[in-house]
Swiss-Prot record:
This is Beta-ketoacyl-[acyl-carrier-protein] synthase III. HAMAP family: FabH (MF_01815). CDD domains: KAS_III. Keywords: Acyltransferase, Cytoplasm, Fatty acid biosynthesis, Fatty acid metabolism, Lipid biosynthesis, Lipid metabolism, Multifunctional enzyme, Transferase. It comes from Helicobacter acinonychis (strain Sheeba). The lineage of its organism: Bacteria, Pseudomonadati, Campylobacterota, Epsilonproteobacteria, Campylobacterales. The active site is at 115, 255, 285. The gene is fabH. Belongs to the thiolase-like superfamily. FabH family. The last Arg residue of the ACP-binding site is essential for the weak association between ACP/AcpP and FabH.
Length: 331
């Protein structure tokens, strides 16, 4: 291989409106202590009424492109992961975001892998770059999860937040600046564990019209148990496959769904506190945006530097899951 795919830049964006746990006490049977004890979440950000996922994503994308020392016209492909797209069926959020960036006549499409979306993005971008088809791929995890939440459901609405993270994937000749490995999986037999109901109208030929709210539904206990079991196995697998140990990893950046899930994986693999990046307490679960937002924050805080090896993992609706070993190829 003449070159490898490389994560050249990372940027994140969080909306300005900060919603603390106490805000939910006004309309739900809950408390700040109850939420934090069970999830580790203290606050989250919500986008404004007029903002969409693409609006959040374009802010992160512009900064990622700038940090890669490129212009929007240098981008060959745009891929967005989201469970809260701007439009229900079409156009894709990637197309909308491309237009807002001023990118024309370049391919753009969405990926639907829920909270595992960013790992899927890495897999797709790595394949396209290393095949030689595209040189610079913009990947964006952008979510306005607040648009799909039922604020009468204590089990879901307290968990999620809005935000976006973006990366430019380019080329490198150096293995230790590359996306070393990505593994993704899914099992649709558990699709009813985490989903949003069908919202498209039935055909006029249906004898009985069925409608449902477009709100996120989750079997919390079942998802928690499967997530811990699956992620432990998946992370062990990717480390063993690449002959690496936890101590070889500079930063462990998991999907920020629930502090208890993160701690279970961290303790099992004996990661030190300084290796683990945590943002769940301040942003909640931002689905496909959570990993790039955590990466972006680590970069901005000076914790992530060129050549650092990151271990990423995620689990989400589908059910989907995946992990990645990524050297930071930026500066």
């Amino acid at each position: 291989m003449e070159f490898y795919a490389s994560l050249k830049s990372i940027a994140m964006h969080a909306p300005s409106e900060c919603i603390k746990n106490v805000a939910f006490q006004e309309f739900l049977d809950t408390s700040d202590e109850w939420i934090e004890k069970r999830t580790g979440i203290k606050e989250r950000r919500f986008a404004s009424v007029g903002e969409k996922s693409s609006d959040l994503g374009v802010i992160a994308a512009k900064q990622a492109i700038e940090r890669a020392h490129l212009t929007p016209q240098d981008i060959d492909l745009v891929v967005v992961a989201t469970l809260s797209p701007d439009f229900l069926a079409m156009p894709s959020t990637a197309c909308v975001l491309s237009a807002k960036l001023g990118i024309e006549n370049k391919p753009a499409f969405d990926i639907s892998a829920a909270c595992t979306g960013f790992i899927y993005l890495l897999s797709v971008a790595k394949a396209y770059v290393e095949s030689g088809m595209y040189e610079n791929v913009l990947i964006v995890g952008a979510e306005k999860t607040s648009s799909v939440l039922d604020f009468k459901d204590r089990g879901t609405c307290i968990l999620f937040g809005d935000g976006a993270g973006a990366c430019v994937i380019g080329r490198t000749k150096h293995l230790k600046e590359s996306i070393l490995d990505v593994q993704i999986s899914a099992n649709g037999n558990f699709s009813n564990y985490l989903y949003t109901p069908r919202t498209l109208k039935p055909t006029p030929f249906n004898a009985k019209e069925e409608t449902s709210d477009p709100f996120l539904c989750m079997k919390g206990n079942e998802v928690f148990k499967l997530a811990v079991k699956t992620l432990l196995k998946d992370v062990e697998m990717i480390l063993e496959k690449n002959a690496l140990k936890p101590e070889d990893v500079r930063l462990f950046i998991p999907h920020q769904a629930n502090l208890r899930i993160i701690q279970a994986v961290r303790e099992h693999l004996d990661f030190k506190d300084e290796q683990v990046v945590l943002t769940v307490h301040k942003y909640g679960n931002t689905s496909a945006a959570s990993i790039p937002m955590a990466m972006g924050e680590a970069y901005e805080e000076g914790r992530l530097k060129k050549g650092d090896l990151m271990l990423l993992d995620a689990f989400g609706g589908g059910l989907t899951w995946g992990s990645a070993l990524v050297y930071f190829g930026g500066s």
